[in-house]
């Protein structure tokens, strides 16, 4: 399911994630722990939800984005016709650093929240088979 929680307070986010977890009790919740994600990870843990924190660094981001690209190339990922997700995927870009590593991000002034959410979902799901996101 694709559920954006833009400008949503932590308690509401925890409540909505708890409701999703009750519908899908075998799911794995993965949340970025960086900056603003730290308090939500803590709130999810305090609520007793099974959350795995993910620390986003250039290297960890490169790993999950490379995996996402491969999943799309193989046809293992199917996404809803969500204009925000599709727009973010189309705008997302990679730049080669002087070190040779890739740095991935949204262009200046844009967001990559749904791209990162999809990449995180795929990174934990890929060993279990295809990923299908549905609009509900």
Show where each model-derived region lies:
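RNase H-like, metal-dependent nuclease domains and their acidic two-metal-ion catalytic environment used
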Residues: 1-55, 62, 66, 76-136
């Amino acid at each position: 399911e694709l559920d954006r929680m833009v400008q949503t307070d932590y308690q509401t986010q925890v409540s909505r994630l708890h409701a999703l977890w009750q519908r899908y009790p075998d799911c794995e919740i993965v949340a970025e722990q960086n900056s603003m994600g730290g308090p939500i990870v803590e709130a999810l843990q305090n609520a007793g939800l099974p959350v795995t924190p993910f620390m986003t660094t250039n290297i960890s981001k490169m790993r999950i984005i490379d995996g996402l690209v491969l999943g799309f190339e193989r046809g293992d990922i199917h996404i809803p016709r969500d204009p925000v997700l599709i727009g973010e995927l189309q705008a997302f870009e990679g730049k080669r650093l002087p070190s040779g590593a890739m740095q991935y991000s949204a262009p200046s002034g844009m967001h990559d929240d749904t791209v990162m959410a999809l990449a995180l979902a795929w990174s934990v799901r890929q060993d279990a088979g295809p990923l299908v996101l549905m609009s509900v």
